[in-house]
Swiss-Prot record:
The lineage of its organism: Archaea, Methanobacteriati, Methanobacteriota, Stenosarchaea group, Methanomicrobia. This is Cytidylate kinase. Keywords: ATP-binding, Cytoplasm, Kinase, Nucleotide-binding, Transferase. It comes from Methanospirillum hungatei JF-1 (strain ATCC 27890 / DSM 864 / NBRC 100397 / JF-1). One of its GO terms (biological process) is pyrimidine nucleotide metabolic process. One of its GO terms (molecular function) is ATP binding. The keyword Nucleotide-binding applies. Gene3D superfamilies: P-loop containing nucleotide triphosphate hydrolases. CDD domains: CMPK (cd02020). ATP binds at residues 7-15.
């Protein structure tokens, strides 16, 4: 089973991905973790690294191509990343997670230890605008389009455990139909 989990920053993609991976013994490829690690290695914030990626498209493309290669060579995997649902068209189940900007900013504030919510809001808006522009320029993808996704879940409505139950039900249904 190949699964993709996508969503905007702070929507809960990483939390759900690792929860499901443990439940279903699936390998994980996380574009966001790779992106954050590359930013840290360069001593840049996510917004700064996003701007750097605007200047050097090879970084984004490298992450996306590597994720696709690994996903296609493995049949028991969850690919987590903003574009995973677009890039891994062969996935059995493509999920988009959504949450309000305010909710996502609170999560990002807690996760990334911003000095205040205003700074987290500003950084999140800058990052999202930068990413949307890059995806449109590089791949002609409108990140706001949900067209490739089979399942859209609101992460403000349910806990990660409840979301995992919903997704597990979809996985079981797909496995029965194979």
């Amino acid at each position: 089973m190949r699964i993709t989990i996508s969503g905007l920053p702070g929507s809960g993609t990483t939390s759900l991905t690792y929860h499901l991976a443990e439940m279903h013994r699936l390998d994980v490829i996380s574009a966001g973790e790779v992106f954050r690690q590359m930013a840290r290695e360069r001593g840049l914030t996510l917004a700064e690294f996003g701007s750097f990626c605007e200047e050097d498209p090879s970084v984004d493309k490298l992450i996306d191509e590597r994720q696709r290669e690994i996903a296609l060579s493995n049949t028991h995997i969850i690919a987590e990343g903003r574009l995973s649902g677009w890039m891994i068209q062969e996935a059995d189940l493509k999920i988009w997670l959504k949450a309000s900007l305010e909710c996502r900013v609170r999560r990002i504030f807690d996760r990334d230890q911003f000095s205040d919510l205003t700074a987290a809001m500003q950084a999140t808006k800058e990052r999202e605008a930068c990413e949307a522009l890059r995806y449109q320029q590089y791949y002609d993808i409108d990140i706001g389009s949900l067209s490739p996704y089979h399942l859209v879940l609101d992460t403000e409505m349910w806990t990660v455990e409840q979301l995992a139950i919903i997704v597990s039900s979809a996985i079981q249904t797909l496995q029965k139909s194979e």
